[in-house]
Amino acid sequence: MRRGVAVFGLLVLLLAGCRPASRAAPAPTAVPVRPGWQPVSLPVPPGAPGRLALRDATACAGRWFVVGTVVDAAGGTRPAAWSSSDAITWTALRPVPRSPYGEENLLTAAGCRDGRLAAVGGKSGGVHGNPRISTWRAAEDGSLVEVPAEFEVFGGADAVNVGRIAGGPRGWLISGNRATGAAAWVSPDGAEFALVSAVPGLAADGAGRPWVADGVGTPSGWLLVGSMLPVGRTAGQPVVWTSADGRSWRRAVLPGVDGGADLQRVVRVGERTVAVGRRGDRLAAWVEEGGRWRSGGGFGAGARAVSGLAAVAGGLLAVPAEGPTGWWSRDGDAWSPVALPVAVPGGAERSVAVAGSGDVALLVVDDGSQVRLWSARGPWGPA
């Protein structure tokens, strides 16, 4: 009998020692850093009263900008933009529309170059209700002047979307997509944009159908980020495009995963370029240094989209499309959680933007009925 008890005890010990690693205690969750978020107010622009609706924010060379529209009681819109030197005290810019559609523009994207603003706006109209797109640029007197374009430049039969705008050493770049594939619009000064589409690298081809999500200026020219859906497959691949002049583009597919991946936002951080998007079932970064791309770290398990990405405090701040937590990284590899001042709401009617300069970040959250802004100087990462 004693021998049976001993054998049984030995079996218990052996089984205890063979527990699978998955039964081990989970690693402790990092405590989010809590920056000193301060609410920011925007003055209502002159004109009929209405609700502010904001869509984008940007900063460079000591200037901050926010763009959107004013929605009146009847649902009418008019373009609106603001400027600040410290992300706290703001001044409404005077819009100067040059077309009937411009008078009703919703400014959807903002870019900055040498402390000057350029923006993309639109208003649905015409027989088919297609968006009529305009660009806007800062004038010497501080106003924001519409630059009307021929309908086919941004619209026409091949139109799909006109996305984000970025300033760089060679001027301005707008990223978007056409029925032919990816597209870019370039301008040296913002006075007139030229459409570049249906060219090698950007056009859909035997490799698959591309989609561009964002762009950034680099010391050597321009860079676009997005994805490629290979022919016969359902999972996308992360893709970057590079160009010296904005007219000839070279496409490169980056490492992804079996579950699919894409690039949604991109920024320059010092001498590096960092893109963020979805990798499988979470968000992740891809990092370029010295012309070579590599996979960076992952963060935000369960998240599939990032609403904003900005260079802040020598690193980058990413704001997912939904939830109470942002993420900060110094190098794109190790990410730490950052408590946001409010949970980012989900849904198609909401809009979120983030901009950064030095140690300061500006967060814009529009839930479709109310606009809120905050600025903070950090801290952003663990001590």
Task: State where each predicted segment sits.
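N-terminal export and membrane-targeting signals
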Residues: 1-11
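Residue-level hotspots at or immediately adjacent to binding/recognition sites across diverse folds
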Residues: 19-383
